[in-house]
Amino acid sequence: MSSKSLYTITLKGVSQVMLQENIYTGLLFFIAIFYVNQIASLYMLLATFLATYFAFKISLDENSLNSGIYGFNAALVGVAVELFFGVSFFSITLLIFGSVLTVLIQEYFRKNSFSFFTLPFILVVWLFLWLFSIF
Protein backbone atom coordinates (compact mmCIF):
# COMPACT_ATOMS: atom_id res chain seq x y z
CA MET A 1 0.00 0.00 0.00
CA SER A 2 1.39 3.39 -0.94
CA SER A 3 1.38 6.33 1.43
CA LYS A 4 -1.07 8.09 -0.92
CA SER A 5 -3.58 5.26 -0.65
CA LEU A 6 -3.10 5.12 3.14
CA TYR A 7 -4.05 8.80 3.42
CA THR A 8 -6.96 8.30 1.01
CA ILE A 9 -8.25 5.35 3.03
CA THR A 10 -7.83 7.38 6.24
CA LEU A 11 -10.11 10.11 4.85
CA LYS A 12 -12.59 7.44 3.75
CA GLY A 13 -12.51 6.12 7.32
CA VAL A 14 -13.46 9.56 8.62
CA SER A 15 -16.28 9.76 6.07
CA GLN A 16 -17.57 6.31 7.08
CA VAL A 17 -18.72 7.84 10.39
CA MET A 18 -21.71 9.09 8.38
CA LEU A 19 -21.86 5.99 6.13
CA GLN A 20 -20.03 7.66 3.25
CA GLU A 21 -17.09 6.27 1.30
CA ASN A 22 -15.65 9.46 -0.09
CA ILE A 23 -12.34 11.21 0.56
CA TYR A 24 -13.86 14.65 0.02
CA THR A 25 -16.59 13.96 2.56
CA GLY A 26 -13.92 12.81 5.01
CA LEU A 27 -11.96 16.00 4.36
CA LEU A 28 -15.08 18.12 4.91
CA PHE A 29 -15.79 16.31 8.19
CA PHE A 30 -12.21 16.92 9.28
CA ILE A 31 -12.43 20.63 8.39
CA ALA A 32 -15.76 20.99 10.21
CA ILE A 33 -14.43 19.39 13.39
CA PHE A 34 -11.17 21.33 13.06
CA TYR A 35 -13.18 24.55 12.97
CA VAL A 36 -14.81 23.69 16.31
CA ASN A 37 -11.97 21.84 18.09
CA GLN A 38 -8.55 21.65 16.44
CA ILE A 39 -7.10 19.11 18.85
CA ALA A 40 -10.10 16.76 18.64
CA SER A 41 -9.86 16.82 14.84
CA LEU A 42 -6.17 15.91 14.99
CA TYR A 43 -6.88 13.12 17.48
CA MET A 44 -9.63 11.87 15.15
CA LEU A 45 -7.32 11.88 12.13
CA LEU A 46 -4.46 10.22 14.02
CA ALA A 47 -6.73 7.50 15.44
CA THR A 48 -8.20 6.79 12.00
CA PHE A 49 -4.73 6.65 10.45
CA LEU A 50 -3.43 4.30 13.15
CA ALA A 51 -6.40 1.95 12.88
CA THR A 52 -6.12 1.87 9.09
CA TYR A 53 -2.38 1.22 9.25
CA PHE A 54 -2.83 -1.51 11.88
CA ALA A 55 -5.56 -3.21 9.82
CA PHE A 56 -3.24 -3.13 6.80
CA LYS A 57 -0.26 -4.50 8.75
CA ILE A 58 -2.20 -7.49 10.07
CA SER A 59 -3.65 -8.15 6.60
CA LEU A 60 -7.35 -7.74 7.29
CA ASP A 61 -10.08 -7.81 4.65
CA GLU A 62 -8.83 -5.73 1.71
CA ASN A 63 -12.26 -4.55 0.54
CA SER A 64 -13.19 -3.34 4.02
CA LEU A 65 -9.79 -1.73 4.40
CA ASN A 66 -9.99 0.11 1.07
CA SER A 67 -13.45 1.45 1.85
CA GLY A 68 -12.33 2.89 5.20
CA ILE A 69 -14.39 0.55 7.35
CA TYR A 70 -11.57 -0.10 9.84
CA GLY A 71 -11.14 3.60 10.55
CA PHE A 72 -14.54 4.96 11.50
CA ASN A 73 -14.76 3.54 15.02
CA ALA A 74 -11.24 4.75 15.70
CA ALA A 75 -12.21 8.22 14.44
CA LEU A 76 -14.95 8.34 17.06
CA VAL A 77 -12.57 7.05 19.74
CA GLY A 78 -10.09 9.80 18.85
CA VAL A 79 -12.66 12.53 19.41
CA ALA A 80 -13.92 10.91 22.64
CA VAL A 81 -10.42 10.50 24.07
CA GLU A 82 -9.67 14.19 23.53
CA LEU A 83 -13.06 15.15 24.97
CA PHE A 84 -12.83 13.04 28.14
CA PHE A 85 -9.08 12.96 28.80
CA GLY A 86 -7.76 16.18 27.26
CA VAL A 87 -4.34 16.55 25.72
CA SER A 88 -1.57 14.60 27.42
CA PHE A 89 0.86 11.76 26.94
CA PHE A 90 -1.72 9.57 28.70
CA SER A 91 -4.47 10.48 26.22
CA ILE A 92 -2.16 9.81 23.26
CA THR A 93 -1.45 6.38 24.76
CA LEU A 94 -5.20 5.76 25.10
CA LEU A 95 -5.71 6.92 21.52
CA ILE A 96 -3.15 4.42 20.21
CA PHE A 97 -4.48 1.56 22.32
CA GLY A 98 -8.10 2.45 21.51
CA SER A 99 -7.44 2.61 17.78
CA VAL A 100 -5.92 -0.85 17.76
CA LEU A 101 -8.61 -2.24 20.04
CA THR A 102 -11.45 -1.00 17.80
CA VAL A 103 -9.92 -2.84 14.86
CA LEU A 104 -9.57 -6.07 16.84
CA ILE A 105 -13.12 -5.90 18.20
CA GLN A 106 -14.52 -5.04 14.79
CA GLU A 107 -12.68 -7.89 13.13
CA TYR A 108 -13.88 -10.34 15.79
CA PHE A 109 -17.49 -9.30 15.15
CA ARG A 110 -17.03 -9.41 11.38
CA LYS A 111 -15.59 -12.93 11.47
CA ASN A 112 -18.47 -14.09 13.66
CA SER A 113 -21.11 -12.47 11.43
CA PHE A 114 -22.27 -9.91 13.99
CA SER A 115 -23.42 -6.47 12.93
CA PHE A 116 -21.05 -4.17 14.76
CA PHE A 117 -21.72 -0.60 13.54
CA THR A 118 -20.32 1.65 16.32
CA LEU A 119 -20.20 -1.04 19.01
CA PRO A 120 -16.35 -1.18 19.04
CA PHE A 121 -16.24 2.58 19.68
CA ILE A 122 -18.81 2.31 22.47
CA LEU A 123 -17.05 -0.63 24.14
CA VAL A 124 -13.62 1.02 24.00
CA VAL A 125 -14.82 4.38 25.34
CA TRP A 126 -16.87 2.70 28.09
CA LEU A 127 -13.83 0.63 29.04
CA PHE A 128 -11.65 3.74 29.24
CA LEU A 129 -14.25 5.67 31.25
CA TRP A 130 -14.79 2.74 33.61
CA LEU A 131 -11.07 2.09 34.11
CA PHE A 132 -10.31 5.72 34.78
CA SER A 133 -13.59 6.62 36.56
CA ILE A 134 -14.54 9.67 34.52
CA PHE A 135 -18.32 9.78 34.39
Predicted features by range, described:
Residues 56-64, 107, 111, 133:
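Transmembrane helix-loop junctions in multipass membrane proteins, especially transporters and channels
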Residues 1-60, 132:
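N-terminal signal-anchor module of multipass membrane proteins
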Residues 25, 39-46, 67, 89-93, ...:
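Short, aromatic-rich membrane-interface segments at the entry and exit
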Residues 129-135:
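Juxtamembrane boundary at the C-terminal end of a transmembrane helix
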Residues 43, 47-51, 55, 59, ...:
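Alpha-helical transmembrane segments in multi-pass membrane proteins
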Residues 61-76, 113-117:
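Short, non-helical or kinked segments that cap or interrupt transmembrane helices
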Residues 28-34, 76-83:
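Generic transmembrane alpha-helix signature in multi-pass membrane proteins
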Residues 4, 59, 84-85, 114:
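Juxtamembrane helix-boundary/capping and inter-helix hinge elements in multi-pass membrane proteins
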